[in-house]
Amino acid sequence: MAGKKNVLSSLAVYAEDSEPESDGEAGIEAVGSAAEEKGGLVSDAYGEDDFSRLGGDEDGYEEEEDENSRQSEDDDSETEKPEADDPKDNTEAEKRDPQELVASFSERVRNMSPDEIKIPPEPPGRCSNHLQDKIQKLYERKIKEGMDMNYIIQRKKEFRNPSIYEKLIQFCAIDELGTNYPKDMFDPHGWSEDSYYEALAKAQKIEMDKLEKAKKERTKIEFVTGTKKGTTTNATSTTTTTASTAVADAQKRKSKWDSAIPVTTIAQPTILTTTATLPAVVTVTTSASGSKTTVISAVGTIVKKAKQ
């Protein structure tokens, strides 16, 4: 946004600072109007109608692009005419590899001193008044109405394609890894396919799958050896061993709350049975004087508890 604003403002200042054309220049411009129709910078149809189409008329944009493309082709044809005198140079330049041209130019610049390196001069000639007026109007609309050309372009239906980036690269034949440096300084295509992250990720995935498969096989083998079946004689011993192992494990797993309370055995008293023949009547003296007697039947058994 800021860069575009600066460009428009600089162009607007350029239009203000430009000197008014003299009558002679006007006459020359009138004579060259026919040439402009064929291949000038701006055609006559490129005028006020373009501003009315900025509101979103896509057909207007397409027509404008077609006109600009035709004009650029005409300009290229006109600029190429003076060079037609030297067909040998053109054929030699076409035969040479672009990388060789870049390398030779880079080598030539690297061997130059800083004082010899200069910025190329401005192109000769002036922009037409028609183009300057258009830039001035675009700048005024941006300042007053807040018009954003980038938003208008992005709102077009053609830019809603999710693969527009890849399509533009293919259409323009752009090398994303390319560079303007010569190969002796930097060669972006000098790396092998294994050096890129796609190949590294693929190799890593293969190794991880191998490790996961080996881990599953080890777990399966351990499980099978634990439940392997033997002969009938070994089956009985295996069952006995398994049962004893299970009991031992169960005893080991018992906590203090699972253990039974120890019971102390108490010796029971021994009961002695004595049979005695007693007289039919036993006289018991209840007092020292012997004044009262009690008769007790003496038939039966007398139980005596042994002393502990």
From Swiss-Prot:
The modification Phosphoserine is found at S18, S22, S43, S52, S113. Residues 79-99 have a biased composition (Basic and acidic residues). Belongs to the HCNGP family. Residues 15-101 are annotated as: Disordered. Plays a role in transcriptional repression by promoting histone deacetylase activity, leading to deacetylation of histone H3. May be involved in the regulation of beta-2-microglobulin genes. (Microbial infection) Involved in transcriptional repression of HHV-1 genes TK and gC. Residues 16-26, 57-78 have a biased composition (Acidic residues). Keywords: Isopeptide bond, Nucleus, Phosphoprotein, Repressor, Transcription, Transcription regulation, Ubl conjugation. The keyword Cytoplasm does not apply. There is a cross-link at K95, K220, K304, K305 (Glycyl lysine isopeptide (Lys-Gly) (interchain with G-Cter in SUMO2)). The keyword Transferase does not apply. It comes from Homo sapiens (Human). Interacts with histone deacetylase complex subunit SAP30. One of its GO terms (cellular component) is nucleoplasm. This is SAP30-binding protein. Its main location: nucleus. The gene is SAP30BP. It is found in: Nucleus. InterPro entries: SAP30BP (IPR012479). Induction: (Microbial infection) In fibroblasts by binding of HSV1. GO terms for biological process: regulation of DNA-templated transcription; response to virus.
